[in-house]
Amino acid sequence: TFEINAMDTFQTFLNACRNGQKSIVKILLERGGIDLNRRDAEGNTALHYACREGYRDLAVLLLEKGADASSANNRGETPLHAAARKGNREILARLLDAGADPDVADREGCTPLMRLVENRRTDAALWLIDSGADTEATDQTGHRALDYATAHGLTEVVARLSQNGSDATDSRDAEGNTPLHQAVYNDQAEVVRTLLAASKAQLDAPNDAGETPLLVACGRGNLHIARMLLDAGADANRPLTNGTTPLHGAAQAGNRFLVEALLGAGAAVDARNGVGETALLVAARAGNNEVVRLLVERHAEVNAANNLQHTALYYAGERGFTEIVELLLAAGAER
């Protein structure tokens, strides 16, 4: 016999669903008196728990017994959102068959597709896209499914969404970042490759801060991605609104090979930023010996002064960078 206090029945039922105990769920349903769509304190129903844990047979049983496929919890999550955690395609299909809206947004504006991508459920995400999910929907911060795929490095999903949405690769988030910006920010080289293959339209597009994807890559010192962007035709001299060029960013990051790649792509060695600094001055002040050495070899103007009339030699001396001081003096820097 299965003795249970009537008051505890609902909690026992929920726990059984949470733990995938289908036989106990069946017994309780046969006894009757269970409200299938009753919510707990967080607003979750039994179906939410079965879907969240990926219990396919249990989810099917609950749906057959009349569970509401569209019930939202306190966070606005439906069973479809819950199913995105494990990404069981059969559960997703059953929920859609039962009338669940594939594009319903939770409190954060996220659709089930976004949650699938966030949980790196590539196969299920591709399936939902093929099932007609809205790929252009945005969450509360202006991000689309493509942005999520970019951030999490799901190249197959990025490729599918780039094919699907005509303007997918041109989309912007709240800070004006394109998917290409986001891939670069997250050091997702394969996603960058996929996006470049889909479209080069946004190659030199600035975000709201004026950064192009190349400027971001150089600021992060990411040589691999910077080379990919340069090979695709990115402008090596496109500056920020304050005059900072990719070369300034690479010099600050201290990546000699990145500086070399930019110079090879036509970056102006003596370009000045808004306060009159050249890349040499930036590198000297940061103590980046190898970058200073390379810039001197490439005939950077060693006596170039910024708006304060300070030179690379001034900053290297002030900060005690002896090797840089010697390099600059040997190249003809004036004390």
Please describe what each predicted stretch is:
Residues 118, 139-152, 164-168, 173-177, ...:
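Solenoidal tandem-repeat scaffolds enriched in leucines and small polar residues
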Residues 40, 73, 106, 139, ...:
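Ankyrin repeat boundary/linker residues
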Residues 2-30, 41-44, 159, 163, ...:
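Intrinsically disordered, low-complexity regulatory segments in ankyrin-centric signaling systems
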Residues 36, 69, 102, 135, ...:
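Ankyrin-repeat inter-repeat connecting loop/turn
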Residues 21-29, 55-63, 88-96, 121-129, ...:
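Ankyrin repeat structural motif
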Residues 15-20, 49-55, 82-88, 115-121, ...:
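Ankyrin repeat A-helix N-terminal signature
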Residues 136-150, 154-161, 307-335:
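Leucine-rich solenoid repeat scaffolds
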